[in-house]
Amino acid sequence: MADTLQHNEWSGKTDGQPWMQRSLIAMFRVLPLWLLYGVMALVVPFYMIFNKKGYRAMYDFFHDRLGYDEWQSFLSVYANHFKFGQTILDRFGVYAGKKYQFFTEGQELMDELEKHPEGFVLLSSHVGNYEIAGYSLKPKRKKFNALVFAGETATVMENRKRVLSQNNMSVILVQEDLSHLFALNSALDNGEIVSMAADRIFGSQKSVECHFFDAKANFPLGAFAMAVQKNVPVLAVFVMKEGMKRYYAYVEEVMCDRHASKREQMEQLAQSFAKRLETVVRLYPTQWFNYYDFWKQ
């Protein structure tokens, strides 16, 4: 059963022991952000050397999917790892009380859905820094439920729950017995917001094939199936880093033909999401954080 809940190529777990993470939070309270970024810039080359699988996957992404030459691909891999490190540092910065600027495009879409009694689904992906959206896209009327990986350290989970709870948000952990599905369905039945990632296949999870960067890629069916079965609206949210303390959030509708068969609706939602994801990744290519061959899932 555990195999169904862990990606075969990429665990998605934040690196570092709990004491290291607690120390990082403490350092954020006394050190400027630019200094920690500088240390990260020096660490990145070593991480690239020892994380060969992740390096290769990102190099192939820039070279094969975006058409970069060899030198440009290499530099982009470094920029990608550095940007990923920055987003992790920013997350711990929030835990330590650091403030960031957020600009949101499409906030009115969320505001409008919150006026209606039914719940809705927010789809995220492993680009930019979606978790930090939980500290900016604050629901005004509805409770927000985020489905998250259960394998993080206690330090990460405690701080995540603490910060989110301040904004009428709660965490639903992925469970081996799949009980999280009941929690998600219950939240939608109660007219609440459900948020989950829609870009990674875990083990034997059912998937849907989509056209993505001029090739076929598999996306998990679960989020789209839930939205269709519950007949609720779907939004995609991408939160991209644009400066040292500045993020830009894109909130977009994910549409399908509600008169089509349920299977066709799921496929249309998945393709609509994949199209929007590709658009954002092309705008921010160094913020694509799936460190495995996405097209060979």
What name fits each language-model region?
Residues A2, F50, E114-K115, P139, ...:
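Non-catalytic C-terminal accessory region of glycerolipid acyltransferases
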